[in-house]
Amino acid sequence: LWGGGTLTLVKENAMNEKDEITDIAHEKYPFLHRVRALRDIGSEVKAGDLGGFVESESNLSTEDDMSWIYDDAIAAENAYVDQNARLFGKAVICGCAYVSQGAALSAEARAEDSAYIRGADLCGHARASGHSMILNSPDTGKAPVLSGTCVVYGTVMGDVHIAGKTVILSEERVSNDTPDTLILNGQERSVIRDSSRDELAPRQPQEKQKKPRNQGRDR
């Protein structure tokens, strides 16, 4: 749950019928082990498939969703993959990072410290650090994309692409609740305008409101 600036993870201790931790240890970090699917997860993961690495069962949701750790990706320490989020390639989440609501980390992207990733895509060598929040917009449903070697310590929300060597500081907030795509690449800023915004549509008729009667009062 996320609210009031405080993130609280609620993890069920019910029997895990989604995955199991194998004895296949990570070559560099032997305290990490691969997971194996116990059932089909979406259309891509079949029962028996090996996944990425975790430190404990608490790193990956055991709920009936499609969250999964692929390839050589890692979820370690108190980090948590939840609500259809996925890790690919050599992505890493660690510390108390929380990745949820269909978010995807690929290549060598990293979420660390207390980063909160909701619905966003991180690729390349992108980093989410500190108390950063990378969030989909509740208004448009669109989510940020982080790529290159960018680092985010602050808040990014909506259809925002952070690329190159861009750094978003902890006190900075970049929010886009429009249909356009906002692009930040180093010191450069640009916009990809949504084509639908250049079209005019007839105004929808509105129900006329009845005027209050004048009960003997002067106008």
Residue ranges and their predicted role:
Residues P138:
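Short, flexible helix/strand-to-coil boundary loops that buttress conserved ligand/catalytic motifs
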Residues G3-M66, D72, K90, C96, ...:
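Terminal amphipathic alpha-helical/low-complexity segments used for targeting or macromolecular assembly
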Residues W68-Y70, I74-A76, Y80-D82, R86-F88, ...:
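Extracellular beta-strand solenoid repeats
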